Every structure is written in C-alpha cells, then in structure tokens.
C-alpha cells in the first residue's frame, strides 16, 4: 500500500482476513479402484443438495464422470481447458446461477469463481501440488457462516498419472539445443531481439 500511496498518489483500502478456514472440513479417503471412487463420489453427492465441484486431472475424466453422473440422474457438467470458450462460459454461468448443481472440472475451473454456497469440493484424484489443492478446496465455504466439506479420493495410480503428465512436459536435450540454436542465430544479427515462444518453436 505504501508504494501506491507514495509513488502513484493512490489511496488503497486494505482488506485483511484470517487465512484459517475453520468452516472447511477435510477428509482423505483411500479407494482401491476407480469404481470404488465413483461410488463414493455418488454417495457424497447424494448426501447433500448444495452446489459441488469435483476436480479431476484430465479432460477425458471430466467428460466421462460428468456424463456418468448425468446418466445416473444428477445435474452435472464438465469444464476443462480444451472446451470452446462459449461452452466454458455457458457451463460456468449455469453453475453460478444454480442451473447446474455439479461441475466436474480440471484445474482450468475456478479462477474468478466466487460462489458462496458451494458446500462440497471433491478431488476425485489428488492435486498436482499442495498450493493447487488449497486453492481448489478453498472454492467451498466462501460463506463463512456455513460449513463445507472437502474430500480427497485417492489410490496408488493417482501419483503415476501425475508422473506421466510431468514426463510429458519435459524437454529433451535435442529440443533444448534447437531452442538455443534459434536464439544464437537471431542474436548474431541483432543486439536485442523480441521473439515469442511460438516463433522459437
């Protein structure tokens, strides 16, 4: 705040809050198979009527689980980064306006989502980091006067999925050399260059 006041002549209003979310209740459940996970998810969703977010790690999982929930008579929609922008906006709007009770989403869902009545967040697979988990679980219980439940359903395959995804993001030595060669080639002609990652690729 001092920087903005001293350098930019702006007065900002400070909002402080306790970081402890005492209205959130955390539970971790081991489930040996995906079928066990799905039945547990169904039981959790059936035990409450509040809006719920189910987090998964892959777009296929979001689609598959949302579709299965709908076939079982629950009001669910998928949300992931591979969806067309209009479909994403529609799914989020329907969730925010309570036309859809359950959103099954990858981590692409949540930025800017402040829905006070989310009472259940289920991580169908473990999150890729503690920071992401805290942020995603924190979508529940935004109304501090209401209690909310946060569940993690996990099995041994969850970590393997994360290691596979992590390995897919690694650059090979050959790819690093190609990028380095492209940068050297461009800087040979100019002292300063401006280039996007797409141009280097």
Regions found by a protein language model. Name each.
Residues 1-183, 190-199:
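Helicase motor core with emphasis on the C-terminal RecA-like subdomain
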